[in-house]
């Protein structure tokens, strides 16, 4: 039977507080507080090796709450430290929310750094529902930083566009109406030029119609099939929209212009990130991008979060649960709930990239399109979102199979073929 030394760490920006336990829940030494920097971590390693040498331990397990990135350098140093090479080292970053729930199960405890460290060590001792252990991987981790920052940029872009549309309604209330939009893409080049170069709708209405047509055609790089129709719709928007009070025209115009600049900057960042991600993906052997609609960015987002399939025993059910594609069962006595709800307790980045990939794949693959349509028709409320999540769950199975076999995607033949 293994007898590992268990160490719980309460991580802070300035210091780390450690608690030591053995497999019986006894403390082989008192607590330790060190600075959260390289000298402090070296002091911890020295204390750790002393305890290991004086006791009958055959391994090390260290757990710390994953508070920001304050735990990362500490774990990375431990994973490669030569003084610990003689013992198997397992490092576990704990979700602080789950640690708090485990602490509640231990009764009415005080809130101190030392107790928080002890709770982490005790959770290690029970071995119940431990997360995947930390491994330093120079292949997946750099890619993960890129894909997670892209997630951050994309969400900021969506948020900024929503804010911009709110300001646009104030400037031209009819501009954003679906049946009256003068441009199919409100954030396209021609639309941005109209919004930035005309301070008010009155200026649009005052412009000779032929000049307005030429302006739209030029800003659209001569790609509009009928710029006259766009100009006509724009004039109708100018006629039907509310008039913004004169006192608000200048500030709203400035806010709208700055918001459009921010959108342009975020779109440039997303494009640059997509290029960097594709370059890194070229060095990773995989066949996910052979799935129709499944480009290198979606493949990177999924691969970076999953990492080594061995962490999940190449089990698609474990990966699906890790992504949060898990519906809790609700049963009591003879009652069995018909409605089940998505857990949302998994990795939000992995869930996001699976859902985005599923939305793209269902537009290019007949089997996934049929599955998506079937799920949409099952309900009236939130049909699209529900169908995308269920399609993403279906996609997990295919992704795991391709990552395991490294074979290109082959569409499943129909029964009549």
Where are these regions (language model features)?
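A detector of single, family-specific signature residues
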Residues: 1-417
């Amino acid at each position: 039977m293994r007898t590992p030394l268990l160490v719980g760490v309460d991580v802070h920006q300035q210091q780390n507080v450690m608690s030591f336990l053995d497999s019986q829940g006894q403390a082989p030494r008192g607590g330790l507080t060190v600075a959260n920097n390289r000298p402090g971590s070296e002091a911890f390693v020295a204390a750790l090796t002393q305890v290991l040498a004086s006791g009958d331990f055959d391994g090390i397990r260290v757990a710390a709450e994953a508070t920001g990135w304050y735990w990362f350098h500490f774990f990375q140093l431990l994973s490669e430290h030569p003084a610990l090479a003689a013992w198997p080292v397992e490092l576990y970053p704990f979700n602080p929310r789950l640690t708090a729930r485990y602490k509640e199960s231990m009764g009415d405890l005080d809130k101190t750094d030392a107790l928080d460290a002890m709770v982490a060590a005790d959770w290690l001792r029970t071995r119940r529902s431990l997360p995947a252990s930390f491994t330093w991987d120079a292949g997946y981790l750099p890619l993960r930083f890129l894909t997670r920052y892209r997630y951050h940029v994309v969400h900021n872009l969506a948020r900024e566009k929503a804010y911009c549309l709110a300001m646009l309604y104030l400037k031209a209330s009819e501009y954003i109406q679906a049946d009256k939009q003068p441009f199919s893409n409100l954030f396209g080049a021609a639309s941005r030029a109209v919004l930035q170069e005309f301070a008010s709708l009155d200026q649009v209405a005052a412009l000779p119609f032929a000049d307005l047509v030429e302006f739209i055609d030029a800003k659209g790089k001569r790609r509009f099939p009928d710029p006259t129709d766009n100009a006509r719709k724009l004039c109708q928007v100018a006629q039907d929209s509310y008039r913004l009070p004169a006192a608000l025209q200048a500030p709203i115009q400035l806010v709208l212009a700055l918001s459009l600049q921010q959108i342009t900057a975020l779109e440039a960042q997303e494009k640059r990130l997509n290029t960097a991600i594709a370059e890194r993906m070229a060095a990773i052997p995989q066949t996910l991008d052979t799935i129709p609609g499944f480009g290198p960015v979606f493949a990177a987002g999924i691969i970076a979060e999953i990492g080594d399939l061995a962490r999940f025993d190449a089990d698609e059910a474990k990966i699906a649960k890790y992504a949060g594609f898990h519906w809790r069962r609700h049963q009591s006595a003879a009652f069995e709930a018909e409605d089940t709800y998505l857990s949302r307790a998994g990795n939000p980045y992995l869930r996001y990239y699976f859902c985005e990939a599923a939305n793209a794949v269902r537009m290019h693959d007949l089997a996934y399109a049929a599955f998506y349509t079937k799920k949409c028709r099952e309900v009236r409320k939130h049909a699209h979102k529900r169908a995308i999540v269920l399609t993403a769950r279906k996609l997990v199975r295919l992704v795991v199979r391709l990552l395991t076999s490294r074979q290109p995607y082959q569409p499943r033949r129909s029964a009549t073929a």
